[in-house]
UniProtKB/Swiss-Prot annotation:
Signal peptide: none
Residues the record lists as binding ATP: 162, 164-166
Naturally occurring in which organism (per UniProt): Lactobacillus helveticus (strain DPC 4571)
GO molecular function, one term: lipid binding
Residue segments, region Domain III, AAA+ region: 118-334
Location of this chain's protein in the cell: Cytoplasm
Region (Domain IV, binds dsDNA): 335-455
Domain I, interacts with DnaA modulators: region residues: 1-74
InterPro entries: AAA+_ATPase, Chromosome_initiator_DnaA, Chromosome_initiator_DnaA-like, Chromosome_initiator_DnaA_CS, DnaA_C, DnaA_dom, DnaA_N_sf, P-loop_NTPase
Name of the protein described by the UniProt record: Chromosomal replication initiator protein DnaA
Gene: dnaA
Entry text on domains: Domain I is involved in oligomerization and binding regulators, domain II is flexibile and of varying length in different bacteria, domain III forms the AAA+ region, while domain IV binds dsDNA.
Length: 455
């Protein structure tokens, strides 16, 4: 008799030996068999999300079949089912396989090439701290690194400043070079592409420019929103994209917003940017922030107890960059005071932190509250569906301010306003943006509200 539980343990032991800890946790930790049909040999397996399902089907199912045949002489038929009980299935994905052992020769070649690419050596998958806000992006990035040009192409990672988009993007480059040291990887800021293009025209070196960008195996473009309103650049990048995509070369882009939100981005680029997968990174939750601080402290050789890490993490809920900045501030304060780092010292060091933080990420509820009080309505009305002017105008202003004062994407803002579509938020933003220039009453209200929210 085929014992599913024992076989699954056997298969997991095989995979644990093959993959490193990061990889194993990515695809096996939250995956389990839920049903086996002894007549058809169909094995139903529960996975966490669409990315995990796609990766198992493409990369792991054959290994599962081979393992079952070797274990029990049975040719199983794996069927993968997404866990519908997952609270946020679209966000729960973890990284994927990296082989633990690499030849020293490959490592040397990797390091030499990486230096020329200007990739940050710290930006690897092993150094990436995962949480609820970035699991899907991390899993997608790992899937791309494992099967470039075929899994999600292009991969479009979007989200606010300092949340780890560049880290994930460069980690893809690091992994490709670790596995294929001779691969041609090009990592650039979008401004670099613009400057290179302009210089190629000026110096009549367009052929060299196109050779650089159209013959690579992996193109990583950071902050693609910089292409907004640049028609000539968009035209050139379109042809670069077409060439790489048709040659099945991987393209990865980051942005602070969705392709549809980038102003004056050509329709054909918007279309192509959405061919693959678009994944959002959101601000880290408390547990993730503590994990980030703990890893940072260990890297710096700092001894900080859990209570102090918890306190620092509770003071910064915006992004990783500001979170690590808070730790640096605490460290500097401890050095100046010649004191050990503890909760009291951290409290003194960060006493003015809240005064200088910008309104971002998770503060849409505050904006709704201030706007509701200003217009003598309720947050429930702002989130509701009433179309009377007394509600519609405050709602649109609240959406406008949410877009202006936070790093939240349009879909996220729509979600905070009763699950409205992102196009509704876009319409509200555009309308208020225009009215500010022509309607003194609206302009005055927006100005007053900004002052109230920011102070």
């Amino acid at each position: 008799m085929f014992d599913i539980e024992k076989f699954w343990q056997h298969f997991n032991d095989e995979m644990r030996a093959r993959f490193n800890e990061v990889a194993y946790n990515a695809w096996f930790k939250n995956t389990k068999p839920i049903f086996y049909n002894k007549n058809t040999h169909e094995l139903k397996i529960l996975v966490q999300n669409p990315v995990a399902k796609g990766y198992w089907e493409k990369n792991l199912s054959s290994q599962l079949i081979q393992s079952a045949y070797g274990y029990a002489g049975i040719e199983i038929l794996p069927v993968f089912q997404i866990n519908e009980n997952n609270d946020s299935p679209e966000r729960i994905v973890t990284p994927e396989p990296r082989y633990a052992i690499q030849l020293q020769q490959e490592k040397r070649a990797h390091k030499q090439f990486t230096k020329n690419l200007k990739l940050n050596e710290k930006y690897t998958f092993d150094n990436f701290v995962q949480g609820e806000g970035n699991k899907l992006a991390a899993g997608a990035a790992l899937a791309v690194a494992d099967s470039p040009g075929s899994f999600y192409n292009p991969l479009f990672i979007f989200g606010g400043v300092g949340l780890g988009k560049t880290h994930l993007m460069q980690a893809i480059g690091h992994q490709m070079l670790a596995e294929r040291p001779n691969a041609k990887v090009v990592y650039i800021q979008s401004e670099t592409f613009v400057n290179d293009f302009i210089n190629s025209i000026k110096n009549k070196t367009q052929d060299q420019f196109r050779e650089k960008y159209r013959t690579c195996d992996l193109l990583l473009v950071d902050d693609i929103q910089f292409f907004a309103k640049k028609e000539g650049i968009q035209e050139e990048f379109f042809h670069t994209f077409e060439t790489l995509y048709n040659d099945q070369k991987q393209i990865v882009m980051t942005s602070d917003r969705l392709p549809t939100e980038i102003p004056d981005l050509s329709e054909r680029l918007v279309s192509r940017f959405t061919w693959g997968l678009q994944v959002e990174i959101t601000p880290p939750d408390l547990e993730t922030r503590i994990a980030i601080l703990r890893r940072k402290a260990e890297a710096e050789g700092l001894v900080i107890d859990d209570n102090t890490l918890d306190y620092i993490a509770s003071q910064v809920d915006t992004n990783i960059r500001e979170l690590e900045g808070a730790l640096v501030k605490v460290q500097a304060y401890a050095t100046i005071e010649r004191a050990d780092i503890n909760v009291n010292l951290a409290r003194e060091a960060l006493v003015d932190l809240k005064l200088v933080q910008k309104n971002r990420g998770l503060q849409i509820s505050k904006i709704q509250e201030v706007v509701a009080n200003y217009f003598q309505t309720s947050t429930a009305e702002l989130k509701g569906k009433k179309r009377v002017r007394q509600i519609v105008v405050p709602r649109q202003i609240a959406m406008y301010l949410s877009r202006e004062l936070t790093d939240a994407s349009l879909p996220k803002i729509g979600q905070e306003f009763g699950g409205k579509d992102h196009t509704t938020v876009m319409h509200a933003y555009d309308k208020i943006d225009k009215q500010i220039k022509t309607d003194t009453e609206i302009k005055s209200a927006v100005f007053d509200l900004k002052q109230m929210i920011e102070h």
